[in-house]
Structures are given as structure tokens and as C-alpha cells.
Amino acid sequence: MMKYTIRNRHTIGIIALVIALCASCSFNSPSIAFPKVQRLYKHTVEEDFVENLAVFAVFQDADGVNDYKELLLQENATGLEWRLHRGNTIFLQESGFSQHEQWVGSNTFAYPRGAFPAGAYTLTLSDLGGNTTSHVFTLQKPPRVTARPFQFTVNRETWQIHVKNSSFCCYFSLVMLSADLQPLRTHHLGKKETETITGSLQELIDFVPDACYIQCFSENQDRSIGFFSAPIPVP
């Protein structure tokens, strides 16, 4: 009787383990929604520009957003790959989203030789069960950037944007940054068609008293290209 009991307990333990493993498996394939791609140009102190590619998409999975494993970006012509694991993925939640959908991606993809070439790219999302879903998109030829499309200045009372190239300057935002240049708050100015835009610096500081830097961000008409000014210390 004792041997039977031990064997029976052992069998029950194996069954419980199998059930636990099955419960942790991912049975549903994920899907991609609302993919967004944008070339980002950062103006450095050395009067130069650095390009990064921002790639985001909504990860949808019936098993929940915690089933997300990684994002893979591939240049189809060369096979070059950029891989994001959970640890270096940016997760963004949006009002109205369920527990089965979440924005995933990054704005720091960098090409090894300057700007990302025009052509086809494949975005692939995978879950913990090894299920994948892909989306192919096409990048247009990168713009020829030789000068800042706008000038951003700050004094103790006001901030000012002076537009130099309107083709790159349709929508504007102001980003308040921490001492280590992490974004604290983004103030969207919306679509602007005037050559000069001015506002109160104090109004921005009132929202984020601990901000140490301020940065301007512009986007073109279809928001496929964005420009960051160099961060300016808050006076």
C-alpha cells in the first residue's frame, strides 16, 4: 500500500507539472497593428546631424501583453538585423487599450553607415511561445539634411522657434528633460504655419519644476521625418 501511494503521488506530481507547463505556454499567435516608422534627426552641439529610426507597432495577443518576447527589424536587401528583447523595448500604453494590446518599439535604431537606405524592411514581433507575425514597409529615400530646419532659442522669460525650412517644420513639440536628459513632459504645439513661434517659458516650468533642459521637436507634413534641437539648459 505504501509503494502504491508513493507511486501515485509521483504520477500526480508529473501531471501537475505538465499542466503548469501547458498553462505557461503561448497558444495564440500575436498580430501587428498601426505600425509607425519615422526618421529622426538630432542636432548635435558640433552642428552635425545624427539619424535614428523610430519603429513602433501595437502588439496584439490574446494571451496578454506579457506574452511579448522580442521585436526584429530587418533590411530586406542586405539581411541586416536589429533585435529588441523585452529589456530594451519601449512599452507605451494608450487609453482605450485592452490588456491584450500595447505599443512596442524603439526610437534608437541606428544604421552602421549613416542614414537608413531606401527600400523594403520587415518588422517581426514574436511571443514567448515562438509565434511570430510580420509586416513589410518601405522607407523612402532619406532627405538631404545640410542645415537646421529651425532655430530654437530660450531666455529667462520666453522660448522662440524660427522656421528656416518649412518642408520639415509642420508640427512642433517642446520636450522638458531631466538632468540626465530623460524626457519628463512633452508639450504639443500642434500644426504651425507661421515663421516665428513664441511662448512663455515659465508656463512650461510650472508644469515641470524639476526640468533641467528643454528641447524642440519638429515633424514634416506626413510625420515621416522628425528633427530634435540640441537640449538647452533651463535658465
Model-derived segments and spans:
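Sec-dependent bacterial lipoprotein signal peptides
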Residues: M1-C25
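Proline/serine/threonine-rich low-complexity linkers at boundaries of modular beta-sandwich domains
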Residues: C25-V37, T133-P143
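Contiguous beta-strand segments within globular domains
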Residues: L40-D61, N66-Y68, Q151-C169
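Solvent-exposed loop/turn segments flanking beta-strands in beta-repeat/beta-sandwich domains
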Residues: A62-A77, W82, K164-Q182
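Aromatic sugar-binding surface patches on proteins
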Residues: T89-A110, K191-Q202
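Short, aromatic- and glycine-rich surface loops/edge beta-strands on solvent-exposed regions
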Residues: A115-G129, L174, I205-G226
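Edge beta-strands of extracellular beta-sandwich domains
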Residues: T132-Q140, D222-P235
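Low-complexity, Pro/Ser/Thr- and charge-rich linker/hinge segments at domain boundaries
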Residues: L139-H162, P233-P235
